[in-house]
């Protein structure tokens, strides 16, 4: 009797150990530091389909907290508390096809924001609505993402869609509110030749934000400024113009060369251009400013995923931002003639880095 029980117990123990080993291997494959080397290429959905050999679904909750005694950037406030829940999945349908998805929900607070009454400051600055009072804001965000990739002979094909919705508001005066919707679609293709995946992807992006500030107290209101640059404003339309609408978007081109054996030189090039249009929404619609952003991100390096993982790569990130102000004539009823356009804001940013990885 003991002998009969021993054999099933031994088989169960071996099965549990094999299952645990397989699960550990899967988690390691999806979370290893080496993936950071391949992350730029995975922006192309065709290459993302080759990211992993195994399937994995993960659920996790996190909280990001920061507190400053003095704000480093006034428009971003003195800190935040942003808890979030995430769900991620990557499923291999076969040796030649994969699907993936991501969903997240964030709901938290941002503290002591001043001189900024507009959501997505990093995206839209300096063309924001601002006041000198400010305060804490509540922030809510939804993100959904899904993609599919397949391989047909030497060809890799993939598509991906991302949607982001955000809601930022303050429930005391000045009661700012920003409602954001953003949709991004990527299409990618790659070809296998000479030991490399040669890939290209195209991205289209559409962005909208409704932005306004209200006052409920009877003690009066504070002026809202239509910011146009570093400490500059569009004085004519500052003060009581507190309802704005932003719309815009842009395009990206991604080019990649990835060695099939994970050993050799590789490169990534990201070219992008975006435009964001600001208009006043009162009893009329008045175009006010246009913000332009052109960017180049390039990565070139060498890597070897052998017994020891080694990589050395250089990154160059360049962005050119400029802002146009529309010169508006005297109104006739609710019509404002446009007399001209002046470029009154320019800002160039360049970041470079050299990274080595060994493990």
Name each model feature, range by range.
Residues 20-111:
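N-terminal, post-signal peptide beta-strand-biased segments of exported outer-membrane/organellar beta-barrel
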Residues 53-59, 95-101, 153-159, 194-200, ...:
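Outer-envelope beta-barrel architecture signal
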Residues 55, 79-85, 138-144, 174-185, ...:
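Residues that define the transmembrane beta-barrel architecture of outer-membrane proteins
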Residues 61-69, 105-109, 152-154, 163-167, ...:
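Transmembrane beta-strands of outer-membrane beta-barrel pores
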Residues 69-76, 112-118, 169-177, 211-218, ...:
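Outer-membrane beta-barrel translocator domains and adjoining extracellular loop/strand segments
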Residues 85-91, 144-150, 185-191, 253-259, ...:
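Residues on the lipid-exposed face of transmembrane beta-strands in outer-membrane beta-barrel proteins
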Residues 113-130, 219-236, 333-340:
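Surface-exposed loop/turn segments flanking beta-strands in extracellular/periplasmic regions
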Residues 147-171, 180-183, 268-281:
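Surface-exposed extracellular loop regions of Gram-negative outer-membrane beta-barrel proteins
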